[in-house]
A protein has these predicted regions:
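Glycine-rich phosphate-binding active-site loops on the catalytic face of alpha/beta enzymes
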Residues: 75-85, 242, 359-386
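Ferredoxin-type iron-sulfur electron-transfer modules and their immediate structural context
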Residues: 317, 323, 328, 374-375, ...
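A Rossmann-like FAD-binding core segment of flavoenzymes
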Residues: 583-633, 638, 642-657, 679-778
Length: 983
C-alpha cells in the first residue's frame, strides 16, 4: 500500500455520513454524539458550544476527521497547518510511521500532506457538512462552531500566491468551486432544507494561529503576526514553543517526573524565541490587535523537539506531545499569566485531557485543543466526556485568566499521577501472535495470563454482584484464588487495554473480592466426584503448584496425596512472604478448596523416595518441590540467604533488628526482605547492579518499598562485607543483554556503605541433590514436564526455576490434563455475557479505579468489542463491518490511510492493522502498489481479490466462484450494506 491518501469527494462524503447514520447511528465510527445544551461561549465575534476541539494535526487534516470530532463534541477546530511546501513534496519529507502515541506522544509530522488547494477544499467540505448535520441531526446550533486556520512558516510563504489565496478563500469561500459544489450536493440530498443551505455562510474562518519553525527570529514572528492582524484583519494566536522556558527548566521538570530518558540538547533553546524578546513583542501585538478591534493571544504550546534515540520513529528528531508536555505547557501558561496579569488570552494545546480540562477551563484557559488523547483507544469519543465535564460550569466571555489557579495547576502537575512516568519501562501490551485477517477481537488480559483466566467474564459477574458464580468461574482454571488474588504477578494487568486510558483494571483486587464474597457459596456447592480407579497420584511438595495440582486432580476424581515436610501447606507464601503481604487465613482458604475434593495430605516429614512411592501404587508422581536453595553470592562476610532469613523472621513473634542490613537483589523477594528489615528497626538498603528502571520486581512492590523509606543504592555490586561496611564496585550500564536490560559493567571505582549483614536475594535454585537422589536428571525433561524417570514429572519452580505462582498453576493444570487424559470442560454462565451496546458505552470514558470496590465496571470487554484500530485512526481508515450473524469484522479502507502507524500501537496483536487487515481498495493502481490481502470492486458483481494464492477475479453472482466462504460473506456484506465505503 501507499501512504498517499485521497480526499473524498463531497457527494461521496455525505453519502457516507447519511448512510452510516441511518444504518447504525454512527458518524465515521463515532458512537457517542454530543447534542449541545444551548450554552455557548463568544469568541472572534462568533460562538462555540463547547471550548474543545482538535489541535492542528492528524485529527484536523481531512473533512471526515473534522466531522467525527464535531459529532463527539468538538466545536473549535484548529485545522491543520498549511504552508508553501505541500502535497507530494511535503509528504516525501514525512517518514512512515510518523506517530507514536502509546504513552506520551511523539510525531514526525509537519503541515498538511495535501496540496494547499486540497486542504482548503477539505475544510470547506467539513464546514458545510457540519452546518447541515447540526441542523438535520440536531447536534447543535449551525453557528455554534468555529474554524481557526493555522498557517506557517515565514512571511514570504504566507504572502505568496498559494497560501494567500488559501487565507482569502477561507475568509470568504463564496466564489470557490468547492463551496458551490457543497451547496449543490446538500440541496439535492436535503431539498426540504434548501433555504437553510442557501443561507450557509461562506466565511469559513475569521481567525488564524501562526506557526513558525524552530529558530524563527522574533522580528519575523512579529512581522507575520502584524501582517495577519493589519492586512488580513484576522483574530490571531501566535504559537509558542516550550523552549521559551529555557533548557534548565525543561530538563529539570522532565527529569523530576521520570522522563530523564528523553534526550534533547540546548540548541533549540538557544535559537528559538527568548523570553526577553517575547514579552515586549506580545505587548506590542496585543496593542495592535486592540487598535484593529481584533483579539490577540498565544497558542501554548507547540510540540517539543527531542532526539530519537531508541528507534521510536524513523527520523533523528521527533516532536513530543501528550502527558509529558503538559507540565511544560502549563508552566508556560503560568509565566505568561503572571507576566500579563491574566490579560493575555491563551489557546491551550499540550497534554489536555479529561483529567485536566475542567481545571484549565476554570482558570480561564480556552479554547482547549487536543491531539494525543484522541489518538488513543476511545479516539474521538473521548471528546464527549470532556465536554460533559465542563458543561455545567459557567460559560462566560473571556475577561482574563486566573494566575493563581494556573500557578496551582502548574505546581500540582509535577506530582500528578496522570503526568508522572512509571518507574520501570512499560511492558509490551501486545500478544506474540499475528492478528487474524478475520475475527480478531480478543481480550489481551486473557492472553497475558499463563492460565488464560476468563477475566472479562468474571469481571462482569463481579460487576453484577454475582460473586459466587464469579468465583466458580475463576476456580475452573485457578485453584488458588486467594493467593493469586493477593500476590499474583498479574501480567494480565500489563496487557489490559485500559492502560491506554489511565490505568489497568484492578483485576487482581477484583479476583480477591470475588474470592472473599463468593467463598461460602462456592464451598457449599462443591461435591466429591466419582473416584477414578486406575490412577493414583503423589505430589511431593505442598506449595502453590502442589496444592493447585491436587485441586485439579481431586476435582476429576483422581486419588491424590500431597507429601509436605513442613507442618502446613503453603510453601513460600506461608513461610517466606511476610504477613503484611499475605495472611495465613488467605492461604488456608485455598487449601480448604483443595481439601473439599478429598485430597489426602501428609505433613511434617519428608516424602518417600520416588521408588518407594511407585511401590506404594502411585501411577504418577509430581515433583513440586520449589526452588528453596539459596542463590550464590560469592563475597566474604556476614551473608545470609534470603529464604532462610525470611523464614526465621516470620517465625519470631516480635522480632527486633538493629544496624544496617543490605539486601542484594531486586526482585519481589528482595523488596519483601528490605521491607521486613525496615519494619523491624534496621536501616534497610537495596543494592542493585543496574538502576530502578531495570529491577525485576513488580512496579507496585517497588513503589511500596520506596514509600516505606528503604534506601536504594543503584549501579553497585557487592565485593566484601567486613566491620560494619560493605565494599562495592561502582557499575555503569553497557549494551543491552538478552533480556533487553542494559548490562552492568565495572567502572573501576569502588565505594563503601554501612552494612552489618548482607541478605542475598539473587535468585533461588532448585535442589538438584534431591532430584539426583531420586534419579532425576534436571537437564533431561521430556514433553509436558516428564523427567527421564517414567511417570515422574516436575512442575512449578522445580521445573522452571524461580517463577510466579500463576505459572505454577499453569504447570499444575497441564499435569492434571496429562493424568486425566483430557482438558477440563466447563461452561461460562450466561450472566457473564456483555452486549455490544454495553461494551460500546465504555469507549472513550476515562475513570480511575476506586479502592475496595469491584473494578468490573471499568473493564472494556475487549473480546466483545475491541476496535482499538478503529478508534485510534485519525483518518477513520479502519471500519467496523457488522455481519449478518452479529459478529464484527474490521476492514481497512486504503484510500483514507497515510500509514501514520498509530493503529499499530494499540492493536493487541504483534501486527499492523493498516497492513494486516482485510483491505478495501479504490483503484487497480492502489491494489497493485499494495501487498495487503483485500478486494477491489470492479462493478456490483465482479471483484478483484488478493488472497493467499495471489490476485484473482471473482464473479459474486456465480454460485461456484471458489471464493473462501468467510471472505465471500464479508465481501457481500460490504457490497450490500457498506457500499458507501468505496462508491
Amino acid at each position: 500500500m501507499s501512504e498517499k491518501m485521497y480526499p473524498i469527494p463531497f457527494d461521496s462524503l455525505m453519502n457516507w455520513v447519511t448512510s452510516e447514520y441511518a444504518q447504525c447511528g454512527d458518524v465515521f465510527g463515532v458512537h457517542k454524539h454530543y447534542h449541545a445544551s444551548g450554552k455557548s461561549l463568544p469568541i472572534f465575534g462568533e460562538r462555540i458550544e463547547t471550548p474543545f476541539g482538535p489541535a492542528a494535526g492528524p485529527n484536523s487534516q481531512l473533512a471526515q476527521n473534522i466531522i467525527a470530532a464535531y459529532a463527539a463534541g468538538a466545536r473549535f477546530f484548529e485545522v491543520k497547518t498549511v504552508q508553501k511546501m505541500d502535497g507530494a513534496e511535503l509528504a516525501a519529507c514525512v517518514p512512515r510511521p510518523c506517530i507514536l502515541a502509546a504513552d506520551e506522544g511523539y510525531n514526525q509530522e509537519w503541515s498538511t500532506e495535501l496540496t494547499v488547494q486540497q486542504a482548503q477544499d477539505e475544510y470547506i467540505k467539513a464546514w458545510c457538512a457540519l452546518k447541515i448535520m447540526s441542523k438535520v441531526y440536531g447536534f447543535g446550533d449551525p453557528d455554534g462552531f468555529v474554524f481557526n486556520m493555522s498557517v506557517g512558516y515565514d512571511l514570504d510563504g504566507i504572502k505568496g500566491r498559494k497560501v494567500n489565496t488559501y487565507i482569502n478563500n477561507m475568509m470568504d469561500a463564496g466564489k470557490t468551486a468547492q463551496f458551490k459544489e457543497c451547496k449543490k450536493v446538500l440541496t439535492e440530498l436535503f431539498p426540504e432544507e434548501k433555504d437553510f443551505i442557501a443561507s450557509i455562510s461562506p466565511n469559513v474562518s475569521r481567525s488564524v494561529t501562526l506557526s513558525t519553525l524552530h529558530g524563527c527570529p522574533p522580528q519575523e514572528i512579529e512581522r507575520i503576526a502584524s501582517y495577519l492582524l493589519k492586512e488580513k484583519h484576522l483574530h490571531t494566536f501566535v504559537k509558542c514553543n516550550p523552549t521559551i522556558l529555557g533548557y534548565k527548566t525543561a530538563r529539570s521538570i522532565l527529569d523530576s517526573m521520570g522522563y530523564d530518558y528523553i534526550v534533547f540538547d540546548e540548541h533549540h533553546f538557544n535559537e528559538d524565541l527568548q523570553w526577553e524578546d517575547a514579552v515586549p513583542m506580545f505587548e506590542r501585538l496585543q496593542k495592535l490587535a486592540d487598535k484593529q478591534g481584533l483579539e490577540f493571544g498565544l497558542k501554548l504550546s507547540n510540540t517539543f523537539p527531542v532526539d530519537t534515540t531508541r528507534g521510536e520513529l524513523p527520523n533523528e528528531e521527533m516532536y513530543m506531545s501528550g502527558r509529558s508536555l503538559f507540565p511544560l505547557t502549563i508552566e508556560m501558561c503560568n509565566r505568561i499569566s503572571r507576566q500579563f496579569g491574566g490579560k493575555m488570552r491563551i489557546s491551550f494545546a499540550g497534554g489536555a485531557d479529561y483529567f485536566n480540562c475542567d481545571k484549565l477551563f476554570a482558570a480561564g484557559i480556552w479554547p482547549i485543543t487536543v491531539a494525543t488523547t484522541i489518538l488513543k483507544p476511545g479516539g474521538y469519543n473521548r471528546l464527549q466526556q470532556m465536554v460533559e465535564k465542563v458543561e455545567d460550569m459557567p460559560y462566560r466571555a473571556f475577561s482574563g485568566s486566573d494566575p493563581a489557579a494556573i500557578s496551582d495547576l502548574a505546581a500540582s502537575a509535577l506530582h500528578d499521577f496522570h503526568h508522572l512516568k512509571a518507574i520501570k519501562p512499560l511492558p509490551s501490551r501486545k500478544k506474540d501472535e499475528q492478528v487474524p485477517l478475520l475475527d480478531c477481537f480478543t481480550a489481551p488480559c486473557k492472553g497475558g495470563c499463563p492460565i488464560e483466566q476468563d477475566i472479562p467474564e468474571y469481571l462482569e459477574l463481579c460487576r453484577k454482584g454475582l460473586y459466587g458464580p464469579a468465583l466458580r468461574l475463576i476456580t475452573e482454571k485457578n485453584a488458588l484464588p486467594f493467593i493469586t488474588g493477593t500476590i499474583c504477578a498479574h501480567r494480565c494487568q500489563g496487557k489490559c487495554s485500559r492502560n491506554f486510558y489511565e490505568e489497568s483494571v484492578h483485576i487482581r483486587e477484583t479476583k480477591l473480592l470475588a474470592a472473599e464474597k463468593g467463598y461460602n457459596t462456592l464451598m457449599a456447592s462443591l461435591r466429591m466426584p466419582e473416584p477414578v480407579e486406575d490412577k493414583k497420584v503423589a505430589i511431593v511438595g505442598g506449595g502453590p503448584t502442589g496444592i493447585a495440582a491436587a485441586y485439579f486432580l481431586g476435582r476429576e476424581g483422581v486419588p491424590t496425596t500431597i507429601f509436605e515436610r513442613e507442618r502446613k501447606l503453603g510453601g513460600v507464601p506461608r513461610y517466606v512472604i511476610p504477613a503484611f503481604r499475605i495472611s495465613d487465613e488467605a492461604i488456608d482458604k485455598d487449601v480448604a478448596l483443595m481439601e473439599r475434593y478429598g485430597v489426602e495430605v501428609k505433613l511434617g516429614k519428608p516424602a518417600p523416595s520416588v521408588e518407594q512411592l511407585k511401590k506404594m501404587g502411585y501411577t504418577h508422581i509430581l515433583m513440586a518441590t520449589g526452588a528453596w536453595k539459596p542463590g550464590k553470592l560469592d563475597i566474604e562476610g556476614n551473608v545470609q540467604g534470603v529464604i532462610e532469613w525470611m523464614k526465621r523472621m516470620k517465625k519470631q513473634v516480635k522480632p527486633c533488628l538493629s544496624g544496617s542490613i543490605v539486601v542484594v537483589g531486586a526482585g519481589n523477594t528482595a523488596m519483601d526482605a528490605a521491607r521486613v528489615a525496615k519494619r523491624m528497626g534496621a536501616h534497610a538498603t537495596i543494592l542493585y547492579r543496574r538502576t530502578k528502571k531495570f529491577m525485576p520486581a513488580d512496579e507496585h512492590e517497588l513503589q511500596l518499598t520506596i514509600d516505606e523509606g528503604v534506601e536504594f543504592v543503584e549501579l553497585a555490586a557487592p565485593v566484601k562485607q567486613s566491620r560494619g561496611k560493605l565494599l562495592c564496585d561502582k557499575m555503569i550500564l553497557g549494551e543491552p543483554d538478552e533480556s533487553g536490560r542494559r548490562s552492568p559493567v565495572k567502572s573501576g571505582e569502588q565505594f563503601t556503605i554501612p552494612c552489618d549483614m548482607v541478605i542475598s536475594a539473587v535468585g533461588e535454585q532448585v535442589d538438584a541433590e534431591l532430584m539426583a537422589a531420586n534419579g532425576i536428571e534436571m537437564e533431561r525433561k521430556g514433553p509436558a514436564f516428564e523427567t527421564n524417570v517414567p511417570g515422574v514429572y516436575c512442575a512449578g519452580d522445580a521445573h522452571r526455576g524461580p517463577a510466579t505462582v500463576v505459572e505454577g498453576i499453569a504447570d499444575a493444570a497441564r499435569f492434571a490434563e496429562i493424568v486425566v487424559g483430557h482438558p477440563h470442560i466447563y461452561d461460562i454462565p450466561a450472566e457473564a455475557d456483555v452486549t455490544e451496546f454495553d461494551a460500546q458505552a465504555k469507549k472513550g470514558i476515562l475513570s480511575m479505579a476506586s479502592k475496595c470496590v469491584c473494578d468490573g465496571e471499568r473493564c472494556l470487554q475487549c473480546s466483545t468489542v475491541c476496535e482499538n484500530c478503529v478508534d485510534s485512526c485519525p483518518n477513520r481508515a479502519n471500519v467496523v463491518i457488522k455481519m449478518a450473524d452479529g459478529s464484527h469484522e474490521i476492514v481497512h479502507v486504503d484510500k483514507m490511510c497515510n500509514e501514520c502507524g498509530n493503529c499499530t500501537q494499540f492493536c493487541p496483536y504483534a501486527s499492523e492493522p493498516c497492513h494486516d487487515k482485510f483491505t478495501l481498495f479504490q483503484t487497480k493502481e492502489d491494489m497493485d502498489e499494495s501487498e495487503n490481502y483485500g478486494v477491489l470492486f470492479e462493478d456490483d458483481d465482479m471483484v478483484r481479490l488478493r488472497y493467499e494464492d495471489g490476485v484473482k477475479e471473482y464473479d459474486l453472482a456465480s454460485c461456484d466462484n471458489d471464493l473462501p466462504v468467510e471472505l465471500e460473506a464479508l465481501i457481500l456484506t460490504v457490497r450490500d450494506k457498506y457500499s458507501y465505503l468505496y462508491t
